[in-house]
């Protein structure tokens, strides 16, 4: 990245960092069970709820407890269950049409980040009928208060239940972009471990590593605060203490609860302090090839951390202490290596292989451009990179994919 652009990026990030205390950040109110939602809905005098979820959630029957509670309270509801991974503008349009057709005045995002992001986007479109989603992309373009928005995460990872962002993919161009504004923060986050008990081990692993990525990128960036550093450290501690238990013993309700809270803390951390190039590259892969976001983050996180080099050693040392991998006497570079290696070992334990077979070399300039456009100047990363420099990560993934395929063929 040239010097002038670096100066612009750092000035932009510094201005946002200075503004943090004056911006209307808020944390959602936490409730521990979907059974508490009818009382909340009635308290807000809402009359018809749109539940936005996906087909997999419906097949697993995860909404049944919520539906039963709503029926017993006499609250009408409508379900939109066509949300896909990396939700598209088509999903938002279909759900919005249902919202208006049924006369809804409250929204529940029930599922992973895709369902919650779709719910946020529907809420934004409901109050901004004369603007397209594309016109709302970027920062602070929604302005208006959304209908009552509640989030029920069924994975412990995305943190969307805490954040001001909705990430949507244009169905035509496959460009993935974020809408960022304070009204998109859900009013209530339901951290109900019972809805996560049936989560398969591999999804438990990749979404848990998504939460870890949120915490790490928020912590190592240049726009942290006392609060965000504290939230990130709590998230890392909880993840390292609980992710293996949740992976191996999915019915362990305490581990599931702790992972939900870790995801919540990580979401709070990156809402104020942002993420970094792991997310920017992962979003480009999700938009172009529909690569699951948590999987992309898990593969990319150690690659990007190593590329940052020694400039993040001190911060990784503190994260290593939180993870129980080092103490204050451990040299910074050793602690940093321990932390990165522990992430690589975590991937190996969970069977996460370095394969993104969809990548085409001819797509790399476009993908790197998308990542650059998302990250710069907004993300306060430790080391700035432009599109040409970001291309290396896609080539790394191609090389790793080739090695993994060769290894499999030799077995």
Tell where the protein language model's regions lie, with residue ranges.
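C-terminal charged capping/lid subdomain of soluble metabolic enzymes
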Residues: 2-7, 326-411
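Carboxylate- and glycine-rich phosphate/diphosphate-binding segment that chelates Mg2+/Mn2+
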Residues: 68, 165-273
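Active-site pocket-lining segment
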Residues: 291-354
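N-terminal small/polar loop signature for handling phosphorylated ligands or for N-terminal nucleophile
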Residues: 50, 58-130, 245-256
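Glycine/threonine-rich beta-strand-loop-alpha-helix active-site module
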Residues: 90-194
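An N-terminal, well-structured beta->alpha segment
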Residues: 1-73, 77-79, 400, 404, ...
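Glycine-rich phosphate/pyrophosphate-binding beta-alpha loops
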Residues: 157, 264-297, 375-378
């Amino acid at each position: 990245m040239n010097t002038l652009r670096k100066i612009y990026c750092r000035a932009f990030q510094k201005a946002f960092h200075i503004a943090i205390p004056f911006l209307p950040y808020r944390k959602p109110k936490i409730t521990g069970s979907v059974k508490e939602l009818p009382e909340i809905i009635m308290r807000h005098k809402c009359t018809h709820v749109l539940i936005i979820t996906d087909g997999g959630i419906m097949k697993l029957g995860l909404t049944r407890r919520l539906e039963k509670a709503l029926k017993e309270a006499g609250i009408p509801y409508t379900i939109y269950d066509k949300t896909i991974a990396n939700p598209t503008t088509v999903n938002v349009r279909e759900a919005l049409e249902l919202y208006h057709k049924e006369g809804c005045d409250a929204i529940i995002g029930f599922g992973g980040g895709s369902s919650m992001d779709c719910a946020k986007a529907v809420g934004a479109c409901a109050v901004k009928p004369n603007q397209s989603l594309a016109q709302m992309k970027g920062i602070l373009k929604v302005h208006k208060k959304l209908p009552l928005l509640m989030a029920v995460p069924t994975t412990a990872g995305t943190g969307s239940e805490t954040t001001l962002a909705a990430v949507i993919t244009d169905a035509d161009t496959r460009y993935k972009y974020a809408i960022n504004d304070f009204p998109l923060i859900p009013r209530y986050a339901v951290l109900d471990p019972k809805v996560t008990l049936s989560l398969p081990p591999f999804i438990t692993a990749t979404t848990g590593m998504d939460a870890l990525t949120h915490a790490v990128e928020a912590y190592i960036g240049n726009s942290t605060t006392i609060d965000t550093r504290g939230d990130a450290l709590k998230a890392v501690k909880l993840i390292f203490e609980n992710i293996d238990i949740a992976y191996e013993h999915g019915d362990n309700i305490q581990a599931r609860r702790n992972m939900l809270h870790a995801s919540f803390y990580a979401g709070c951390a990156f809402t104020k302090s942002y993420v970094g190039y792991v997310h920017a590259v992962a979003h480009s892969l999700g938009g172009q090839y529909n690569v699951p976001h948590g999987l992309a983050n898990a593969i990319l996180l150690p690659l990007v951390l190593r590329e940052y080099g020694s400039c993040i050693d001190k911060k990784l040392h503190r994260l290593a202490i939180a993870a129980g991998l080092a103490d204050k006497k451990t040299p910074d570079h050793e602690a940093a290596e321990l932390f990165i290696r522990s992430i690589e070992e975590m991937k190996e334990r969970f069977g996460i292989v370095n394969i993104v077979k969809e990548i085409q070399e001819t797509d790399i300039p476009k993908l790197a451009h998308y990542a650059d456009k998302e990250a710069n100047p907004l993300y306060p990363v430790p080391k700035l990179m432009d599109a040409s420099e970001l291309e290396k990560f896609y080539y790394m993934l191609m090389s790793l994919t080739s090695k993994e395929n060769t290894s499999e063929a030799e077995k």
